[in-house]
Amino acid sequence: MAVATSAVVNGGYLIKPSLTKLGDDKRYENQIFSEETSEIMRYLLSQVVAKGTAKEAFNKDADKAYTEDGKFKYLVGGKTGTSHKIDKKSYTREKLTTFISVLPIHKPKYVVLISLDDPKGINREYGEPYNTWNWSDAGWNAARVSRQIIDRVSPILDIKARYIPNENMLINTSL
């Protein structure tokens, strides 16, 4: 999933996973779609965090997620996923929640994949904007865990997970 997401956001190139740093000539394999498609996908993934299913994790529970003038500061994109598990014959009541995040979304460098096996819901802790999956969907838990990890590793990795977008941003908001 991380390799596929990397291709979606890096200009369409499949990347060979490695635990050590490789030269660019050894990292990139095939280009499977265009830079333009990748830019559109980066914009869409940023909207999951800004306005979509991961919004609650990245703004309501975040320390200073907005600037004083109300502009969104997280430079993260991602995708939530919630599903019922399946046994031999049917779906069960147990769930699997996943959030894959990319940062910084304008020039992707890192992918964080969080997958939680049958998480417990956060019951009304954040008000009641919606009650999907009894407060145990990926936007309520896996995305929140991802945000907490991003908050902690961003200073260590010397990346700006939070910043104020400007006109020079690659993402075209007029789509």
For each predicted feature, which ranges?
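Active-site beta-strand/loop architecture of penicillin-binding DD-peptidases
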Residues: 1-30, 36, 45, 53-158
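Betabetaalpha-Me/HNH-type nuclease active-site subdomain
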Residues: 50
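Short, highly charged C-terminal tails/helix-capping segments
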Residues: 159-175
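Extended, non-catalytic substrate-recognition/exosite surfaces adjacent to catalytic cores, especially
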Residues: 30-32, 171-172
